[in-house]
Curated annotation (Swiss-Prot):
Protein name (database record): Ribosomal RNA large subunit methyltransferase E
Organism expressing this protein natively: Pseudomonas paraeruginosa (strain DSM 24068 / PA7) (Pseudomonas aeruginosa (strain PA7))
Role according to the record: Specifically methylates the uridine in position 2552 of 23S rRNA at the 2'-O position of the ribose in the fully assembled 50S ribosomal subunit.
GO cellular component labels: cytoplasm
Reactions accelerated catalytically: uridine(2552) in 23S rRNA + S-adenosyl-L-methionine = 2'-O-methyluridine(2552) in 23S rRNA + S-adenosyl-L-homocysteine + H(+)
Gene3D superfamilies documented for this protein: Vaccinia Virus protein VP39
Active site: K161
Cystine pairs: none
Coiled coil, from the record: none
Matching SUPFAM superfamilies: S-adenosyl-L-methionine-dependent methyltransferases
Length: 207
């Protein structure tokens, strides 16, 4: 089957992408690692010994970065609907985050340990129809914020991929009510044509 012009363009962009080449060189599973590395360099959200939850973790780029920083004394619970090759000392839960049973398994894995940081690079399978994609993306964001509200310790932080569009302003407002400080980040490694941004909320206010 002949490749479409769109897929040919994607393949060329992918293999010409300096971040793809860097990931191969540095041993990271995806170019997404550099988004978290950039945010870490600017904001220092990861520290040794932390307990972290990584949502939308596959193929494991963010989990690799996180695991390297938090070290042996840290604790990382990762989840994705897709399979993920194991990473030492990472607890992985495979399943659809929108299903109550999977949500419950994540909560069970966390247990009574207060969480220092929740990170999420989740996105739905995009159809290209913005009117359909945006609500699905925002629904995942809302579920992630709900989880963060349940498990974060007072003073904990939250980082999530989010797309500008319907529901964004209300979500931003909700995050400001739950955290002391909310900022937006657009890493250089995020493709220019992408609408994705990262919302960084710091200082969870707790109950």
């Amino acid at each position: 089957m002949a490749r479409s012009k769109t897929s040919q363009r994607w393949l060329k962009e992918h293999f010409d992408d300096p971040y793809v080449k860097m990931a191969q060189r540095d041993g990271y599973r995806s170019r997404a690692s550099y988004k978290l590395l950039e945010i870490q360099e600017k904001d220092r959200i990861l520290r040794p010994g932390m307990t972290v939850v990584d949502l939308g973790a596959a193929p494991g780029g963010w989990s690799q970065v996180t695991s390297r920083v938090i070290g042996d004394r840290g604790r990382l619970i990762a989840s994705d609907i897709l399979e993920m090759d194991s990473i030492p000392d990472v607890t992985f839960i495979q399943g659809d985050f929108t299903e109550d049973a999977v949500f419950a398994r994540i909560l069970e894995a966390i247990g009574e340990h207060p969480v220092d940081l929740v990170i999420s690079d989740m996105a739905p399978n995009m159809s290209g129809v913005r009117a359909a994609d945006q609500p699905r993306a925002m629904y995942l964001c809302e579920l992630a914020l709900d989880l963060a509200g349940r498990v974060l310790r007072p003073g904990g932080d939250f980082l999530i991929k989010i797309f500008q569009g319907e529901g964004f302003d209300q979500y931003h407002k909700q995050a400001r009510e739950m955290f002391d400080k909310v900022q937006m980040r657009k890493p250089l490694s995020s493709r220019d044509r992408s609408r994705e941004q990262y919302l960084l909320a710091r200082g969870f206010r707790g109950e």
